Structure formats: structure tokens, C-alpha cells
Amino acid sequence: MTNLVRWLFSTNHKDIGTLYFIFGAIAGVMGTCFSVLIRMELARPGDQILGGNHQLYNVLITAHAFLMIFFMVMPAMIGGFGNWFVPILIGAPDMAFPRLNNISFWLLPPSLLLLLSSALVEVGSGTGWTVYPPLSGITSHSGGAVDLAIFSLHLSGVSSILGSINFITTIFNMRGPGMTMHRLPLFVWSVLVTAFLLLLSLPVLAGAITMLLTDRNFNTTFFDPAGGGDPILYQHLFWFFGHPEVYILILPGFGIISHIVSTFSGKPVFGYLGMVYAMISIGVLGFLVWAHHMFTVGLDVDTRAYFTAATMIIAVPTGIKIFSWIATMWGGSIQYKTPMLFAVGFIFLFTVGGLTGIVLANSGLDIALHDTYYVVAHFHYVLSMGAVFALFAGFYYWVGKIFGRTYPETLGQIHFWITFFGVNLTFFPMHFLGLSGMPRRIPDYPDAYAGWNALSSFGSYISVVGICCFFVVVTITLSSGKNKRCAPSPWAVEENSTTLEWMVQSPPAFHTFGELPAIKETKS
């Protein structure tokens, strides 16, 4: 009973962070299963495993996206690493609103349940994660599936908004003595910017899907031209949320990578303030570029010119971050432990994804490439090899601090190389498919595309082996005995550590700080 009470009613940021990690792992495995089903269907031309049920294919695509974005990356990055380490890094005893933190987590399992139900009732929700009307309207999806998906999004949105309020309050009001804003670790800054993005963008999504809900069930016509509505309005509202959302997914990763690169290069991050302002700029600019997802809907040519230019401007702060990471490594004594491998892999592959993003920013080119596999390749490079690599990097970096046990280094490196090989083999060929005009969200294709698709599917099977490796690492780490105890600061002598989490024992006490730490100076 005591255990049940501890985990169900927890107000401790570490316990809630651990719950987020477990939840993210479960959702991640489910999302991966769906992606493998997608790749099995696309492994060769013709109908493969879904027996010609093309609606089911789109249900898989939709569920894969929602699971990975709202139930894997966001809970693990913001809920997991954010909850665990933001209070420790700023020298706070806990989050500002511990019970709000608890409800933020417990809104997610019901939300996940609603999403899974949506896939199981009637013919499921085969709309893609964008849920565009009229396809998501009552005439095209007549059952309750889309409505369930909408309620699922509402719940996970409320969870994220409450969480972001909590993070903003915590970071502004609960820093320890001497911890000025300009001394905040970069991961804390990244979570702060992310929280503001969530707070400003999610209500817009909530408005859009609520209007969709009333269009479907109460005969309103927000998105129906027959009653004076406009489906393009939905696209504007959705992408005004959807574009900041992709920065929400990657920004905490930026913070994690900054810490890791600094630690394993043995020197402070190059250009700390530049890094902070780059993140803030990315956050601000993220709200000014949404229509680049809509170049094909007949926007005015001047509008397209603006959104092309604005999108390219985002590459500037992003480039500042990448070159600062490289400058941090420059001349350092680099140790290629597993976290650093994932961090370097992140920098390399995120850069590739960013470059294809610059290609797609050109409205003229995008009209040819829109809704092809080129776009799929682009965002999977920044998510599947950006966000996910950052998650793995953060896991290996902090796992000793979280569980108080060291992970098997060799197996971690094997996990990295298998995953690195698998994801590249999966997504690199998609650039070629897109350039040849293979459209997204279609379960069958002409024979000409067979070769690259077969390669891509093979790559996804390798990625699954990598994920199995990862869970073996987790199992070994959790079941290792007292001889595998983790030092307070496993990566450096405590005197050389630049952030607070390495000053406390591994794992930290239930109440981290007996008295709040005072910060005298920081090495940067």
C-alpha cells in the first residue's frame, strides 16, 4: 500500500520524473511497433501486410506520429529530464507546484488510452497527425474515432500547459542563492524556452481542435465552405501550434547536448550567452514561420516570399549553436564515452536534417517536394536522429545519477553504432524517393521505387535491434549489484564539475538539498 501511495500521489519531482520516463518508454515501444508495421507494408510494391486496407495504413501513420510526439519525446524530454534535473540544477528543493506536477503526469495515461481507443473504434482515425478537415470532418470520418483523438489531444495539451506553468514559475522563482539567470545551466534555459513555447502554442491547437469537434458534432461550419467557413483557417491554426511544437521537441535536446559536449571535451561551453540568446531567438522565430507548411495551398506570392525568408533566418541561431558545439570540442581532450557518441551523432545528423530543411524553405522547390518522402526524410532526421539521439545521450549521461548504478559502457557503444547505422539506412534513401516524387501517406507505390524502399525497411529492422540493445542496457543497469555503484560525479572529479547535479550523491536523496546551495562563481 505504501508503495502504491508513493507512486500514485507523489509530489516529489524525482518520482514524477521517473514515472514520465516509464510512460515514455512504453509509448515509445508502441510507436516503434507501428513504424515497423508501416515499413513492412512499404518493404515492397503491392499490398503486403494490411491486405489492401489503406485506411488502416493511415491509422497506423496517425497513431505512430501521436505516440512518438506527445507520448514519447515530450514526456521523456520535458517530463522526465526536465522534472528530474531542473530543480537540482538550479538548487531548488522541488518544483514550485508539486501537486500540479502530479496531475500533469496522471493526465497522460488517460490521454494515451483515448488515443488507442480512437485507433480501435469504427475504422480508426486515418487523418495523419495534422487532422486536416474535410478529411477529419463528420462526412469523411463518421465514427467516434476522430473525436476520441481530439479529446486525447486536449488532455495531453492540458498536461503540457500545466507542466509549462510549473517550470516557468520554478525557474523564475526558485533558483538558489547566487544562481542568477546568466548562471543558469543551458539545459534549464532550454526547458524555460520550451515551456514558454508550450504555453503560447498549445491553446491555439486546443481552439482549432475544439472548432473541429463542434464542426463534427454540433453542425458549426468553422472549416466548412458551405457555411462560410474555410478549411485553410484550420491549417493556419494548426501550424501556428505545429511549428513551435517541433522546436519544443528539439530544444531540450539542445540543452542536453550542450552539457554533454562540455563535459566530455573537458571545457565550458563556447559562447554561453550566445547559446542562450540563440535558443531564445529560435523560440521567437518559431512563431513567425508556420505557413511554410502551407506553400501549396495558394498563398499570395508575397506571403510565400516572407515565409521563405523567415524560415531561412531560423538557420542562423541554429547554426550558432552547432558551431558553438564544435568550438567547445575544438582543442578539448575529448572522451568518446556513449553519451558523447550520441552527442556527436546528434550534431552531425541534426545538421543534415537542418540542411534539408533549408532546401524545403524555398517555396518554389517545396511545391515540388511537398508531401513527398523528402519531407519525411527531413523531419525524421531532426526528430528520429535529433530528439531521440538527445534522449539516449541524456539517458547515458545521467543514468548513473538517476539510478545510482553505472551502465555497461561497451553495450552502450554497441547500442549507439547499431542505432546510428539503422536510422541512417532507414531515412537516407527517403531523400531519393522524395526527389523522384514518391508521395507520403500512401501504402502502395510503383515498382520504380522498390529498391530504396526495400533498403529503408531493412534499416528500420536494424533500428529495432538497436532499441532491444537499449532495453538490455537498462535491464543490466537496474539489476546490477552494489559493485556497480555510481560515484557522485562519474565523468569528472567533483571539483571539475560545473553543474550542481554532480555535487549530490547518486542517486540523490529523496529531498535533494538539506540546505540550499549558494553559488559563488561559475566556470564560463
Swiss-Prot record:
Which residues participate in heme a3 binding? 378
| Binding-site list for O2 | 247
Residues annotated to bind Mg(2+)? 370-371
**Pathway, per record:** Energy metabolism; oxidative phosphorylation
GO terms in the biological process aspect are: electron transport coupled proton transport; mitochondrial electron transport, cytochrome c to oxygen
What are the binding positions for Fe(II)-heme a in this chain? Answer: 64, 380
The compartments listed are: Mitochondrion inner membrane
The lineage's top-level taxon is Eukaryota
Task: Tell me the keywords, alphabetical order.
Answer: Calcium, Copper, Electron transport, Heme, Iron, Magnesium, Membrane, Metal-binding, Mitochondrion, Mitochondrion inner membrane, Respiratory chain, Translocase, Transmembrane, Transmembrane helix, Transport
**Record-annotated membrane-spanning stretches:** 18-38, 66-86, 103-123, 148-168, 186-206, 237-257, 269-289, 312-332, 340-360, 379-399, 414-434, 458-478
Q: Does the keyword Transmembrane helix apply?
A: yes
Cofactor field:
heme; Cu cation
Q: Give me the residues that bind Ca(2+), please.
A: 41, 46, 443
Q: Which SUPFAM superfamilies match?
A: Cytochrome c oxidase subunit I-like
Q: Does the keyword Transmembrane helix apply?
A: yes
Q: Which InterPro entries match?
A: Cyt_c_oxase-like_su1_dom, Cyt_c_oxase-like_su1_sf, Cyt_C_Oxase_1, Cyt_c_Oxase_su1_BS, Cyt_c_oxase_su1_dom, Cyt_c_oxidase_su1_bac
Tell me how this protein sits in the membrane: Multi-pass membrane protein
Q: Where is this cross-link: 1'-histidyl-3'-tyrosine (His-Tyr)?
A: 243-247
**Pfam families to which the protein is assigned, alphabetical:** COX1 (PF00115)
Q: Which GO terms describe its cellular component?
A: mitochondrial inner membrane; respiratory chain complex IV
Binding-site residues, Cu cation: 243, 292-293
Q: Which reaction does it catalyse?
A: 4 Fe(II)-[cytochrome c] + O2 + 8 H(+)(in) = 4 Fe(III)-[cytochrome c] + 2 H2O + 4 H(+)(out)
Role noted for this protein: Component of the cytochrome c oxidase, the last enzyme in the mitochondrial electron transport chain which drives oxidative phosphorylation. The respiratory chain contains 3 multisubunit complexes succinate dehydrogenase (complex II, CII), ubiquinol-cytochrome c oxidoreductase (cytochrome b-c1 complex, complex III, CIII) and cytochrome c oxidase (complex IV, CIV), that cooperate to transfer electrons derived from NADH and succinate to molecular oxygen, creating an electrochemical gradient over the inner membrane that drives transmembrane transport and the ATP synthase.
Recorded family membership: Belongs to the heme-copper respiratory oxidase family.
Name the UniProt record assigns to this protein: Cytochrome c oxidase subunit 1
Identify the species of origin.
Beta vulgaris
Q: Which gene encodes it?
A: COX1
